[in-house]
Amino acid sequence: MKGVEKYEALLTEQTRNLGSDHPDTLTTKSNLADEYRDAGNLEKALEAYEAVLTDRARVLGPDHPDTLTTRNKIAYTYSIAGNPLKAIDMYEAILTDRIRVLGPDHPDTLSSRSNLAEAYSDAGKFQESIDMYETVLPDLTRILGPDHPRTLAARGNLAYAYNTWGSPQEAIGMFETLLADTVRSLGPDHRHTLATRGNLATAYMDAGKLEEAIDTLETLLSDMARTCGPDHPNTFATRSNLATAYDQAEKLEEAIGIYEALLADQNPVLGPKHPDTFTTRGKLANAYAEAEDPQKAIEINEALLNDEMSILGPDHPDTLATQSNLAIAHYIAEDLPEAIEMSEALLADQTRVLGPDHPDTLVTRGNLAAAYAKAGNLHKAIVMNEALLADQTRILGPDHGYTLSTRNNLAYTHLEAGDSRKAVKMYTDLLADHTRILGRDHPKTRAISAELTYLKNEKWRRENRK
């Protein structure tokens, strides 16, 4: 909180010597709000920004660039506070005003377009995000130049959107090209270069290239600690991503060890109630669940959920995500009535808060179907998965990872229901699509191939026993 204390003292001095309406005083008020935001105190940040906005609109006018910038910061804070839909409304209004006041080619106007694209991505509107980035990139290149940090950042965000949309192979190519350009134009230690390396590692993970992801993150972690310091939030984030890579590689003991060490470091540096600390607690709980210790996962998630309810509120996406993880832990513990009850309540909340088409809402529908299947209600699970598959195909597209996962779950449920012929047909089609989209060496492709081989061998054995 040193930054907060510094700006609070400066604000007191400037208010006394310059007056509350002096531009320098207003700038310090804005900087203080920035510090609140960066410390994770988003409620206080929003309160401070709103006060700055009122003062700047009164003193400088509603169309002054500083007033517009304050509105932009408020929208950004709403986005990271888990309210991207409100951020989208604000960004759209700011964009209209910046075009009118500053012109379409002003750097701030271009930033508004990029911010809007990012908010679309946060809201699960990936196609809108990609479309926006692809239209703003040529303008950024024309006006600011291809090597400007904002142009490079927009390229990174576009690649990130492709990866989130379910095209990790395409994202990898984009990130690798971008990395070469950022190293050349900004240098190997620039924050954009380091961020690109981290995003490339994430794309490697999503593409099933886990060894490449681990190697990239281990090297990046060393460079982050050297350039940013061991206690910098970006260094912490890299440690978290490295643990996630170990988790996905089924090296759960290593993942849990990294998460626990990270949590011990985040608590004194960021504070136990910081959003990043919450994220680590959630990831640690998930790792315990995957390590077949669901009771430990339940214990961690219940404590985390209580803290998120009080700090973030019941409707924050992170709070909803923890409810989802808690339901999954109950599912793994085979406490199916509790898992079903929690998932149904969560689905109602996500539909209300995020909307029925948000990816997180769709994931909960899939988890609920899986719980019904495990509880023996296979017909209900099949009906739910078929409806979910239709919606995912419409919203996310047929090649998205979530859509493919639902097809896999549907095939398995048909198999459990005794319809092996239909299951084999679905697995055969799914294997072809996984091979085309993810490649034959992706872990999910290999898993489907192994399942299909097993089913065909079982069919051959049954036929030869007749």
Model feature map: region roles:
Residues M1-K466:
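Intrinsic-disorder-linked linear interaction elements in eukaryotic regulatory proteins
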